[in-house]
Amino acid sequence: MWFQLKIEHCPNDKIEEITEELEECGALSITLTDKNDNPVLEPEPGTTPLWPEVIIHALFAQAEEAQYAREQLVAKRPSLHCSLELLADKNWERAWMDDFRPQRFGNRLWVCPTWLPPPEPDAVNLILDPGLAFGTGTHATTSLCLTWLEQADLKNKSIIDYGCGSGILSLAAIKLGAKHVYAVDIDNQALQATQSNAHANHITESQLSISSPEALQNPVHLVIANILLAPLISLKERFHQLLPSGAHLVTSGILEEQAPLLIDAYDSAFTHIATEYCEGWSLLVFTSK
Protein backbone atom coordinates (compact mmCIF):
# COMPACT_ATOMS: atom_id res chain seq x y z
CA MET A 1 0.00 0.00 0.00
CA TRP A 2 1.07 3.56 -0.74
CA PHE A 3 -0.10 6.86 0.72
CA GLN A 4 -0.31 9.94 -1.48
CA LEU A 5 -0.43 13.40 0.05
CA LYS A 6 -1.90 16.03 -2.29
CA ILE A 7 -1.07 19.63 -1.41
CA GLU A 8 -2.87 22.59 -2.99
CA HIS A 9 -2.84 26.38 -2.58
CA CYS A 10 0.97 26.43 -2.40
CA PRO A 11 2.65 29.83 -2.80
CA ASN A 12 5.28 29.49 -5.51
CA ASP A 13 7.97 31.03 -3.34
CA LYS A 14 7.41 28.24 -0.78
CA ILE A 15 7.48 25.25 -3.17
CA GLU A 16 11.15 24.40 -2.63
CA GLU A 17 10.81 24.78 1.14
CA ILE A 18 7.74 22.52 1.22
CA THR A 19 9.34 19.81 -0.93
CA GLU A 20 12.39 19.78 1.35
CA GLU A 21 10.13 19.31 4.38
CA LEU A 22 8.30 16.47 2.63
CA GLU A 23 11.61 14.72 1.96
CA GLU A 24 12.58 15.13 5.62
CA CYS A 25 9.27 13.51 6.56
CA GLY A 26 10.06 10.44 4.43
CA ALA A 27 8.47 11.15 1.04
CA LEU A 28 9.65 8.58 -1.51
CA SER A 29 8.77 10.74 -4.50
CA ILE A 30 7.51 14.28 -5.05
CA THR A 31 5.79 15.46 -8.21
CA LEU A 32 4.77 19.00 -9.19
CA THR A 33 1.79 19.38 -11.53
CA ASP A 34 -0.06 22.30 -13.04
CA LYS A 35 -3.60 22.83 -11.78
CA ASN A 36 -4.73 24.65 -14.93
CA ASP A 37 -2.57 23.16 -17.71
CA ASN A 38 -0.73 26.40 -18.46
CA PRO A 39 2.46 26.46 -20.57
CA VAL A 40 5.78 27.17 -18.87
CA LEU A 41 7.45 30.29 -20.27
CA GLU A 42 11.13 31.20 -20.10
CA PRO A 43 12.52 30.14 -16.70
CA GLU A 44 16.17 30.99 -16.22
CA PRO A 45 18.69 28.16 -16.81
CA GLY A 46 19.07 26.01 -13.71
CA THR A 47 15.78 27.06 -12.15
CA THR A 48 12.63 25.00 -11.66
CA PRO A 49 9.81 26.08 -14.00
CA LEU A 50 6.62 26.75 -12.03
CA TRP A 51 3.03 27.38 -13.06
CA PRO A 52 0.69 29.99 -11.56
CA GLU A 53 -1.03 27.27 -9.47
CA VAL A 54 1.05 24.25 -8.53
CA ILE A 55 -0.17 21.01 -6.95
CA ILE A 56 2.35 18.89 -5.04
CA HIS A 57 1.93 15.11 -4.87
CA ALA A 58 4.08 13.29 -2.30
CA LEU A 59 4.20 9.50 -2.04
CA PHE A 60 4.81 7.73 1.29
CA ALA A 61 5.21 4.08 2.24
CA GLN A 62 3.84 4.55 5.77
CA ALA A 63 0.53 6.13 6.79
CA GLU A 64 2.15 7.59 9.90
CA GLU A 65 4.76 9.43 7.81
CA ALA A 66 2.14 10.86 5.48
CA GLN A 67 -0.08 11.99 8.36
CA TYR A 68 2.87 13.54 10.20
CA ALA A 69 3.90 15.43 7.07
CA ARG A 70 0.35 16.69 6.65
CA GLU A 71 0.16 17.89 10.25
CA GLN A 72 3.53 19.64 10.05
CA LEU A 73 2.70 21.46 6.83
CA VAL A 74 -0.73 22.65 7.95
CA ALA A 75 0.58 23.74 11.36
CA LYS A 76 3.09 26.07 9.67
CA ARG A 77 0.86 27.10 6.78
CA PRO A 78 -2.87 26.96 7.60
CA SER A 79 -3.80 28.12 4.08
CA LEU A 80 -2.54 24.87 2.53
CA HIS A 81 -5.13 22.29 1.51
CA CYS A 82 -3.74 18.79 2.16
CA SER A 83 -5.62 15.59 1.33
CA LEU A 84 -4.47 12.02 1.89
CA GLU A 85 -5.26 9.14 -0.45
CA LEU A 86 -4.59 5.41 -0.09
CA LEU A 87 -3.21 3.74 -3.22
CA ALA A 88 -3.20 -0.04 -3.56
CA ASP A 89 0.02 -1.49 -5.00
CA LYS A 90 -1.71 -2.66 -8.15
CA ASN A 91 -3.44 0.68 -8.67
CA TRP A 92 -0.20 2.61 -8.18
CA GLU A 93 1.60 0.41 -10.68
CA ARG A 94 -1.17 0.85 -13.24
CA ALA A 95 -1.29 4.60 -12.63
CA TRP A 96 2.04 5.07 -14.38
CA MET A 97 2.36 1.91 -16.50
CA ASP A 98 -1.02 2.08 -18.24
CA ASP A 99 -0.29 5.56 -19.57
CA PHE A 100 2.80 4.47 -21.49
CA ARG A 101 2.69 2.48 -24.70
CA PRO A 102 5.23 2.16 -27.51
CA GLN A 103 5.24 5.34 -29.59
CA ARG A 104 6.27 5.65 -33.22
CA PHE A 105 8.01 8.71 -34.65
CA GLY A 106 8.20 8.93 -38.41
CA ASN A 107 8.31 5.63 -40.26
CA ARG A 108 10.85 3.58 -38.33
CA LEU A 109 11.64 4.96 -34.87
CA TRP A 110 9.88 3.54 -31.81
CA VAL A 111 10.23 4.49 -28.14
CA CYS A 112 9.23 1.51 -26.00
CA PRO A 113 8.99 0.94 -22.21
CA THR A 114 10.89 -2.08 -20.90
CA TRP A 115 7.76 -4.00 -19.87
CA LEU A 116 6.28 -4.16 -23.38
CA PRO A 117 7.73 -5.82 -26.50
CA PRO A 118 8.53 -3.54 -29.45
CA PRO A 119 5.65 -3.65 -31.96
CA GLU A 120 8.17 -3.89 -34.82
CA PRO A 121 11.27 -5.81 -33.67
CA ASP A 122 13.17 -4.95 -36.87
CA ALA A 123 12.52 -1.20 -36.57
CA VAL A 124 14.76 1.30 -34.76
CA ASN A 125 13.73 0.68 -31.15
CA LEU A 126 14.73 2.91 -28.25
CA ILE A 127 14.04 1.43 -24.80
CA LEU A 128 13.11 4.09 -22.26
CA ASP A 129 11.12 3.89 -19.03
CA PRO A 130 9.00 6.85 -17.86
CA GLY A 131 10.39 6.54 -14.34
CA LEU A 132 13.67 8.12 -15.45
CA ALA A 133 12.01 11.49 -16.15
CA PHE A 134 13.46 14.34 -18.22
CA GLY A 135 11.61 13.37 -21.39
CA THR A 136 10.14 10.13 -22.71
CA GLY A 137 8.69 11.26 -26.01
CA THR A 138 5.26 12.26 -24.74
CA HIS A 139 5.79 16.04 -24.88
CA ALA A 140 5.13 17.76 -28.20
CA THR A 141 8.63 19.26 -28.39
CA THR A 142 10.30 15.89 -27.85
CA SER A 143 8.01 14.40 -30.48
CA LEU A 144 8.95 17.15 -32.94
CA CYS A 145 12.66 16.53 -32.37
CA LEU A 146 12.39 12.75 -32.66
CA THR A 147 10.38 13.01 -35.87
CA TRP A 148 12.93 15.41 -37.34
CA LEU A 149 15.83 13.13 -36.41
CA GLU A 150 14.05 10.12 -37.92
CA GLN A 151 13.82 11.74 -41.35
CA ALA A 152 17.30 13.33 -41.31
CA ASP A 153 20.46 11.80 -42.77
CA LEU A 154 22.55 11.28 -39.63
CA LYS A 155 25.01 8.72 -41.01
CA ASN A 156 28.56 9.42 -39.81
CA LYS A 157 27.46 12.76 -38.31
CA SER A 158 28.75 14.22 -35.04
CA ILE A 159 25.96 15.79 -33.00
CA ILE A 160 25.53 17.84 -29.83
CA ASP A 161 22.35 17.28 -27.81
CA TYR A 162 22.29 20.51 -25.79
CA GLY A 163 20.10 20.08 -22.70
CA CYS A 164 19.96 16.31 -23.06
CA GLY A 165 17.53 15.56 -20.21
CA SER A 166 16.92 11.81 -20.32
CA GLY A 167 19.21 11.46 -23.32
CA ILE A 168 16.30 10.44 -25.52
CA LEU A 169 17.42 12.57 -28.48
CA SER A 170 21.06 11.50 -28.12
CA LEU A 171 20.20 7.81 -28.05
CA ALA A 172 17.73 8.13 -30.91
CA ALA A 173 20.35 9.91 -33.03
CA ILE A 174 22.89 7.14 -32.41
CA LYS A 175 20.39 4.43 -33.26
CA LEU A 176 19.51 6.35 -36.42
CA GLY A 177 23.11 6.32 -37.62
CA ALA A 178 25.01 9.19 -35.97
CA LYS A 179 28.72 8.50 -35.52
CA HIS A 180 29.07 10.27 -32.17
CA VAL A 181 26.80 12.33 -29.93
CA TYR A 182 27.84 14.74 -27.19
CA ALA A 183 25.04 14.84 -24.60
CA VAL A 184 25.34 17.88 -22.34
CA ASP A 185 23.21 19.33 -19.55
CA ILE A 186 23.62 21.68 -16.59
CA ASP A 187 21.65 19.25 -14.37
CA ASN A 188 23.65 16.36 -12.91
CA GLN A 189 20.48 14.29 -12.53
CA ALA A 190 19.92 14.59 -16.28
CA LEU A 191 23.45 13.38 -16.95
CA GLN A 192 22.87 10.39 -14.66
CA ALA A 193 19.57 9.60 -16.37
CA THR A 194 21.25 9.77 -19.78
CA GLN A 195 23.99 7.40 -18.61
CA SER A 196 21.43 4.93 -17.27
CA ASN A 197 19.38 5.04 -20.47
CA ALA A 198 22.51 4.64 -22.60
CA HIS A 199 23.40 1.49 -20.67
CA ALA A 200 19.87 0.10 -21.14
CA ASN A 201 20.20 0.63 -24.89
CA HIS A 202 23.72 -0.84 -25.16
CA ILE A 203 25.23 2.48 -26.24
CA THR A 204 29.01 2.62 -25.78
CA GLU A 205 31.43 5.41 -24.84
CA SER A 206 32.75 5.39 -28.40
CA GLN A 207 29.28 6.49 -29.51
CA LEU A 208 28.26 8.84 -26.69
CA SER A 209 29.99 11.42 -24.51
CA ILE A 210 28.09 12.76 -21.48
CA SER A 211 29.22 15.97 -19.79
CA SER A 212 28.47 19.52 -18.76
CA PRO A 213 28.31 22.10 -21.60
CA GLU A 214 31.69 23.55 -20.62
CA ALA A 215 33.42 20.41 -21.90
CA LEU A 216 32.37 21.05 -25.51
CA GLN A 217 35.29 22.01 -27.74
CA ASN A 218 35.14 20.50 -31.22
CA PRO A 219 32.82 21.66 -34.02
CA VAL A 220 30.05 19.27 -35.07
CA HIS A 221 27.70 18.67 -37.99
CA LEU A 222 24.52 19.29 -35.99
CA VAL A 223 23.36 20.83 -32.71
CA ILE A 224 19.89 19.96 -31.43
CA ALA A 225 18.57 21.89 -28.44
CA ASN A 226 15.14 21.18 -26.95
CA ILE A 227 15.24 23.85 -24.26
CA LEU A 228 13.44 27.18 -23.76
CA LEU A 229 13.47 30.56 -25.46
CA ALA A 230 15.60 32.52 -22.96
CA PRO A 231 18.52 30.05 -22.86
CA LEU A 232 18.27 29.51 -26.63
CA ILE A 233 18.74 33.23 -27.24
CA SER A 234 21.61 33.47 -24.75
CA LEU A 235 23.38 30.51 -26.42
CA LYS A 236 23.39 31.95 -29.96
CA GLU A 237 27.11 32.77 -30.06
CA ARG A 238 28.05 29.51 -28.36
CA PHE A 239 26.10 27.51 -30.95
CA HIS A 240 27.71 29.53 -33.74
CA GLN A 241 31.17 28.65 -32.40
CA LEU A 242 30.30 24.94 -32.47
CA LEU A 243 28.84 24.89 -35.99
CA PRO A 244 30.88 25.53 -39.15
CA SER A 245 29.24 27.35 -42.04
CA GLY A 246 26.36 25.32 -43.49
CA ALA A 247 25.98 23.05 -40.45
CA HIS A 248 22.51 22.60 -38.97
CA LEU A 249 20.98 23.85 -35.73
CA VAL A 250 17.63 22.40 -34.64
CA THR A 251 15.80 24.14 -31.79
CA SER A 252 12.59 23.32 -29.97
CA GLY A 253 11.02 23.95 -26.57
CA ILE A 254 9.39 27.19 -27.72
CA LEU A 255 5.78 28.10 -28.32
CA GLU A 256 4.46 28.92 -31.80
CA GLU A 257 4.15 32.61 -30.95
CA GLN A 258 7.75 32.68 -29.71
CA ALA A 259 9.22 31.35 -32.97
CA PRO A 260 9.56 34.78 -34.67
CA LEU A 261 11.48 36.07 -31.64
CA LEU A 262 14.10 33.33 -31.98
CA ILE A 263 14.33 33.73 -35.76
CA ASP A 264 15.00 37.46 -35.32
CA ALA A 265 17.52 36.87 -32.52
CA TYR A 266 19.48 34.36 -34.62
CA ASP A 267 19.43 36.31 -37.89
CA SER A 268 23.01 37.60 -37.65
CA ALA A 269 24.50 34.12 -37.21
CA PHE A 270 22.01 31.63 -38.68
CA THR A 271 19.70 31.26 -41.66
CA HIS A 272 16.22 29.98 -40.83
CA ILE A 273 15.27 27.21 -43.30
CA ALA A 274 12.30 25.30 -41.84
CA THR A 275 9.61 25.29 -39.15
CA GLU A 276 7.42 22.49 -37.80
CA TYR A 277 4.50 22.84 -35.37
CA CYS A 278 2.80 20.46 -32.95
CA GLU A 279 0.16 21.20 -30.29
CA GLY A 280 1.12 24.86 -30.03
CA TRP A 281 4.86 24.21 -29.90
CA SER A 282 7.44 24.75 -32.62
CA LEU A 283 10.67 23.31 -34.00
CA LEU A 284 12.97 25.60 -35.97
CA VAL A 285 15.78 24.51 -38.29
CA PHE A 286 18.70 26.82 -39.08
CA THR A 287 21.99 26.65 -40.96
CA SER A 288 25.08 28.40 -39.67
CA LYS A 289 26.30 31.44 -41.63
From Swiss-Prot:
Catalytic reaction list: L-lysyl-[protein] + 3 S-adenosyl-L-methionine = N(6),N(6),N(6)-trimethyl-L-lysyl-[protein] + 3 S-adenosyl-L-homocysteine + 3 H(+)
Biological processes per GO annotation: methylation
Entry's localization field: Cytoplasm
InterPro entries linked to this entry: Ribosomal_L11_MeTrfase_PrmA, Ribosomal_PrmA_MeTrfase, SAM-dependent_MTases_sf
The protein's Enzyme Commission number: 2.1.1.-
Enzyme class (EC, first level): transferase
Superkingdom of the source species: Bacteria
Coiled coil regions in record: none
Sorted UniProt keywords: Cytoplasm, Methyltransferase, S-adenosyl-L-methionine, Transferase
GO MF annotations, alphabetized: protein-lysine N-methyltransferase activity
Presence of keyword Glycoprotein: no
Binding positions (S-adenosyl-L-methionine): T142, G163, D185, N226
Pfam families: PrmA
Gene Ontology CC terms: cytosol
NCBIfam families the record matches: prmA (TIGR00406)
Record's function text: Methylates ribosomal protein L11.
Family stated for the protein in its record: Belongs to the methyltransferase superfamily. PrmA family.
Protein name, entry field: Ribosomal protein L11 methyltransferase
Provenance organism: Legionella pneumophila (strain Lens)
This protein's encoding gene: prmA
